[in-house]
């Protein structure tokens, strides 16, 4: 690979087959320009730009040491051939997986590339933006734009949804959090990206007609993005930890892919994942205990009581929704971020945090709730917050809160 300047990174470059999707194509990142820019936009010139739309359709199944390795791309193509998804959605998902690979590399090299710490800006929700928040948002946005298959994209880091330029525009809407748990970056703890995908819908509860600050395009974006989780076509997340894990559901089960550093491909490692029953782990931020409702306090206190079994629940909390939920998905138990006296509506965002992981957990045999099923809620604004309890023990906490 050709040498790059200190501020420019060349990631996942590999020759491209002339047929259909490519295994890797060159994405160039000028991180200095991205971090120094004001209003974030689709960067041309020497900024962040993604020239890839997906992974290889021609690599097929790789075999190693007598085991058959099925890549994410070959798995997506099988879903397409079976009529589960169409070719356009295959390209969108491939573009998302490419963005995740690039973000994984940026996260792993954050200390080397001076991408730790805050950017000095505040996002629409009043949160200090980390440098990697800004760069990851550009990576995700531009990979989706360059796929040519997305019409509207909405991000945690943007004030309003963005309509993709007409020359690149497609049919799908993608809502995403480019880097969940970014407060963990400096400590090299787990972070992740999550997303969901659906088709346009002209019905929305958002009252935008009287807002003079939104132009026609932005109004159309909001109308299309505010949809109930039951309209989802696909949802997933990518966790950046000791392994890079890509979890995906198309509404027909939960499938787990692990990034193989030898091939640079996501490889299928678990299929039709089901959340274990009778898990003994709870994940709540108990630093907020004094702010909780008395009913919730009683529930948590009872989890700590050994009872007749002599085995109390174990507390595990990372502070990254993706990391905490992934552990809950594998080991069972419950994850919760309730409303409290400080955050009366909860803290997690419905559209790009709660709804996607709730869709995943229901496909895995679990449940998510805020008192109603989160999957059925329809947002009234892009960054709407809701409380969340999710896992395989949700009915128990519902009884306490009733």
Swiss-Prot record:
Binding site for Mg(2+) 3: 177, 180, 353
Binding locations of substrate: 180-183, 285, 317, 335, 337, 347
Gene Ontology CC: one annotated term: cytoplasm
Residues holding Mg(2+) 2: 156, 177, 179
EC number in record: 3.1.3.11
Residues involved in Mg(2+) 1 binding: 127, 156
Pfam families referenced in this protein's UniProt entry, alphabetically: FBPase, FBPase_C
Annotated transit peptide: 1-50
MF terms in GO: fructose 1,6-bisphosphate 1-phosphatase activity; metal ion binding
Pathway: Carbohydrate biosynthesis; Calvin cycle
Catalytic activity field: beta-D-fructose 1,6-bisphosphate + H2O = beta-D-fructose 6-phosphate + phosphate
Family annotation (PANTHER family): FRUCTOSE-1,6-BISPHOSPHATASE-RELATED, FRUCTOSE-BISPHOSPHATASE
Family statement drawn from the similarity comment of this UniProt entry: Belongs to the FBPase class 1 family.
Subunit structure comment from the entry: Homotetramer.
The protein, known as: Fructose-1,6-bisphosphatase, chloroplastic
Annotated source species: Glycine max
């Amino acid at each position: 690979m050709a040498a790059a300047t200190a501020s420019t990174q060349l990631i996942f470059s590999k020759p491209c087959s002339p047929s259909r999707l490519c295994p890797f194509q060159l994405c160039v990142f000028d991180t200095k320009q991205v971090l120094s820019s004001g209003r974030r936009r689709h960067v041309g010139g020497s900024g962040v730009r993604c020239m890839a739309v997906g992974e290889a359709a021609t690599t097929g199944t790789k075999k190693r040491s007598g085991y058959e390795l099925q890549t994410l791309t070959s798995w997506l193509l099988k879903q397409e051939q079976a009529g589960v998804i169409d070719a356009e959605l295959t390209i969108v998902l491939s573009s998302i997986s490419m963005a995740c690979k690039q973000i994984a590399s940026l996260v792993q090299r954050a200390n080397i590339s001076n991408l730790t710490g805050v950017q000095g800006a505040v996002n629409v929700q009043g949160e200090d933006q980390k440098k990697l928040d800004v760069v990851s948002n550009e990576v995700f946005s531009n990979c989706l734009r360059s796929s040519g298959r997305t019409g509207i994209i909405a991000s945690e880091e943007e004030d309003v949804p963005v309509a993709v330029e007409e020359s690149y525009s497609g049919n799908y809407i993608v809502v995403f959090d480019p880097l969940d748990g970014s407060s963990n970056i400096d400590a090299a703890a787990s972070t992740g990206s999550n997303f969901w995908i659906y088709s346009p819908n002209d019905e929305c509860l958002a009252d935008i007609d009287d807002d003079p600050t939104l132009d026609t395009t932005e109004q159309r974006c909001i109308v299309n993005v505010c949809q109930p989780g039951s309209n989802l076509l696909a949802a997933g997340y990518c966790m950046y930890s000791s392994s890079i894990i890509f979890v995906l559901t198309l509404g027909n089960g939960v499938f787990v892919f692990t990034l193989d550093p030898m091939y640079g491909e996501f490889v299928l490692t678990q299929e039709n994942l089901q959340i274990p029953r009778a898990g003994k782990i709870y994940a709540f931020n108990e630093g907020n205990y004094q702010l909780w409702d008395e009913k919730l306090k009683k529930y948590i206190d009872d989890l700590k009581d050994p009872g007749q079994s002599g085995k109390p629940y174990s507390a595990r909390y990372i502070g990254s929704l993706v990391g905490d939920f992934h552990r809950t998905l594998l080991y069972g138990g419950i994850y919760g971020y309730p409303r409290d006296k400080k955050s009366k509506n909860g803290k997690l965002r419905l559209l790009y945090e709660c709804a996607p992981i709730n869709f995943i957990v229901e496909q895995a045999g679990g449940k998510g709730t805020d008192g109603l099923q989160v999957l059925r809620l329809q947002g009234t604004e892009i960054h709407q917050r809701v409380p969340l309890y999710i896992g395989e023990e949700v009915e128990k906490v519902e009884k306490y809160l009733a």
